[in-house]
């Protein structure tokens, strides 16, 4: 699989969803394979580097390609091969659709996200009052 696109509807405002999913302090709460994520700066801007660590202390590094508040957040690995784009659409004051789209330029996706990951994101955010 070279690309993967999944969506989730979350019963929270677009502001809350965008802030939660772009803030590195929250990543480990909804992506089980990540133990820690840090960014050079937050909120990020184009060119900001993020890095995340798995349970075996392996670090992966990414750079921000697009950052449009409450609209889209796109990153790539430093080799510019793996990309991920989060897109956000408001469906009302307390309902947001988020699309997660990941792709590679060469080869196949190693560990594509599943709907379970976005379902966990939904559960975590909706329980966060």
Feature roles, as predicted:
Residues 74-128:
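Beta-strand/loop substructures that line and gate deep hydrophobic ligand-binding cavities in soluble
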Residues 3-7, 49, 59, 72, ...:
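Intrinsic-disorder/low-complexity, polar/charged segments enriched in Ser/Thr/Lys/Arg/Asp/Glu/Gln
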Residues 7-11, 51, 63, 87-89:
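Generic structural detector for well-ordered beta-strands
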Residues 17-21, 27, 52, 64, ...:
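Hydrophobic pocket/interface hotspot
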Residues 38-80, 116:
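Glycine-rich portal/gate segments that line the openings of hydrophobic small-molecule binding cavities
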Residues 1-39:
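Hydrophobic ligand-binding cavity/cleft-lining segments
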């Amino acid at each position: 699989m070279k690309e993967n696109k999944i969506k989730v509807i979350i019963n929270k405002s677009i502001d809350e969803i965008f802030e939660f999913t772009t803030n590195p302090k929250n990543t480990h709460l909804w992506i089980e394979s990540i133990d820690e994520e840090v960014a050079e700066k937050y909120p990020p801007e184009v060119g900001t580097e993020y890095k995340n660590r798995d349970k075996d202390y392996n670090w992966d590094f990414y750079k921000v390609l697009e950052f449009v508040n409450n609209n889209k957040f796109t990153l790539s690995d430093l080799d510019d091969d793996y990309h991920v784009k989060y897109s956000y659409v408001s469906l009302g004051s307390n309902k947001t659709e988020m699309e997660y789209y990941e792709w590679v330029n060469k080869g196949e996706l190693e560990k594509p996200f599943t709907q379970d990951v976005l379902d966990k994101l939904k559960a975590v955010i909706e329980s966060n009052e």
